[in-house]
Amino acid sequence: MATFTQYVEAKNKNLKDLSNEEIYYLLLEFVKEAAAPKPKNDSKRKVYYISAEFLIGKLLSNNLINLGIYKDVKAELAAAGKSISEVEDVEPEPSLGNGGLGRLASCFIDSMATLGINGEGVGLNYHCGLFKQVFKDNKQEAEPNYWIEDQSWLVPTDISYDVPFKNFTLKSRLDRLDILGYKKETKNYLCLLYTSPSPRD
């Protein structure tokens, strides 16, 4: 596996010249490419953990740690005059949960991946599940937290399901997140379903 510096140089870039935002998106690609060839855990018994929310938090540091390269990447950034904590600050907070049960669900799927248990989390892909508070004209207002960007940890799939209602049908599509266990050769998935806005009269 190439180092992050080699990965950056292969794209004809110099780590010292990049902004924290540019470094973050390159690290995102670097980690996803490292995780992509890992096979899905396919042991005979399988656990499905279904939850309305998964409070997974930011994923960059956790994925670097689980791949066993956090210290190496941190040192490479420091050698280039960059701070990994400042790069981590660029990452948007996934709006997939905001409570203790969501945190518990995330801990379970992380633990299953690290213990080598074949398991998948199943939940909803909230595009604006959290909100941020801002002040306008000396008044506090809530704004949606748009966390899904063109480049994100989400891996799109071709899987979809029709969900019929009385007067209309929604198509639910499936995206997933790779859940990496600590220094494991296999991975699990967090499967997230979403739809387009429902039709209104």
Name each region found by the language model:
Residues 12-17, 86-96:
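Glycine- and acidic
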Residues 1-36:
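N-terminal-proximal low-complexity accessory segments that begin disordered
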Residues 129-193:
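Extended, Lys/Arg-enriched charged tracts that mediate electrostatic binding to polyanionic substrates
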Residues 109-110, 114-132:
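Glycine-rich phosphate/pyrophosphate-binding loops
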Residues 30, 34, 76, 107-111, ...:
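Generic, well-ordered alpha-helical scaffold segments in large soluble proteins
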